[in-house]
């Protein structure tokens, strides 16, 4: 785990997953629950501010995916991002219909208009995240690896261990 690069934004999960696939064989990877309960952070949509809420979340996750795919040799362009947007948009609208039907069968209320507005926002965010990705190729949202931290301060891991031992005694 010393070489895992961990994003510090909403790309955390996809970033860690792709790092695990990069560093370990598939048969060495599994998902585990680290808590009995998990509090999901419900976010506002934030249509008018891409730096907040679900809008920021979709931007960060999109950029994380683009960065990881680029490290595997995928080449991106404005045209590629337009194709990704179109593909996402069509599939997402299909899913809205599936969820609407499922909700109706279960007697639940489902606001198609609101869901499709979110699909439109998220589709546009793919384009915006793509622009940022192309304009800022050196953007790095990752915290340093433990190997780098240890190299910068060889005593830090020992200090962490001592602090944990002290807390637990």
Locate predicted features:
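Catalytic donor-sugar/metal-binding loop of nucleotide-sugar-dependent glycosyltransferases
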Residues: 8, 17-37
